């Protein structure tokens, strides 16, 4: 589901949209829309760069050495975020830049559908990562048999299949509508309003609330276990496990904050009288931008909280400079620079 599908100023509801707060035009569009487009542009640029860098770092593991389950889940999260940024934000930006929908029926269905798929893949992947951390720390003796690449890949496949299935009603009910004023809008239309209410509730419960509760449960167990076992762990092992848990926990908290306003808007619009005021307009736009920004903040979190990722980032740039260095370098330097980064560099 997409914020623009509710009866909001983007015009994707079942009734004529109310006018947004009056503002002076700037470059042919309203000031609010112009600012929103600038924010979209920043989110897009930061997200594409950051997620591409994360994918590059994780892809440069030593040949023949299996990737950690944590890294596979992070890789899946980055791929979903990057695909969303590339396939959704540029098209959705036209809603703010143009007075009518010009991209056709397929794009209308696809961007709203993939928006929901990406949201679900993200939360389900974060839930899987929390379970992975729980098994690694609380059940460390059994984790070696459970936390293998094969199981992680099966989990990733299941996450995508479940997300694609859960988002299918969005693609089915998203339609183009034409007005007498020669304007076209990409709207969501459900023949039965009760079905739409049920879908909104199910998406909130199964695509937000329950995964967050599972995540909270796993991290409560992890923190309790670390507190009890603190004295029996080596300082290096203790610091490594705490840092990994901290990184994933921050990613989860940011996700929860980023998507909560989105769900509040949808539930409010379906079950209450959503006010059409300048304040509510600002809240909707803020919810919209927060939801989009979640796809670009995870690489920043890795960079600030994970020392191993920072080292891996530097290694990527170092190898890039190395590849473009003159061939007249000594054999010793060339051999050292051409060595691929160790897999340990990418273990968050």
From Swiss-Prot:
Residues 56-70, 132-151, 219-247, 292-348 are cytoplasmic. Residues 328-348 are annotated as: Disordered. Expression is detected in brain, spinal cord, heart and skeletal muscle. InterPro entries: GAL1_rcpt, Galanin_rcpt, GPCR_Rhodpsn, GPCR_Rhodpsn_7TM. Disulfide bonds join 108-186. Residues 1-34, 92-109, 173-197, 269-270 are extracellular. A lipid is attached at residue 319 (S-palmitoyl cysteine). GO terms for molecular function: galanin receptor activity; neuropeptide binding; peptide hormone binding. One of its GO terms (biological process) is positive regulation of cytosolic calcium ion concentration. Pfam families: 7tm_1. Glycans are attached at residues 7, 12, 182. It is found in: Cell membrane. Keywords: Cell membrane, Disulfide bond, G-protein coupled receptor, Glycoprotein, Lipoprotein, Membrane, Palmitate, Receptor, Transducer, Transmembrane, Transmembrane helix. Residues 328-337 have a biased composition (Basic and acidic residues). GO terms for cellular component: plasma membrane. Three cysteine residues are found in the C-terminus, at least one of which may be palmitoylated. It is a multi-pass membrane protein. The chain crosses the membrane at residues 35-55, 71-91, 110-131, 152-172, 198-218, 248-268, 271-291. Interacts with GRP39 AND HTR1A. Belongs to the G-protein coupled receptor 1 family. Receptor for the hormone galanin. The activity of this receptor is mediated by G proteins that inhibit adenylate cyclase activity. This is Galanin receptor type 1. It comes from Mus musculus (Mouse).
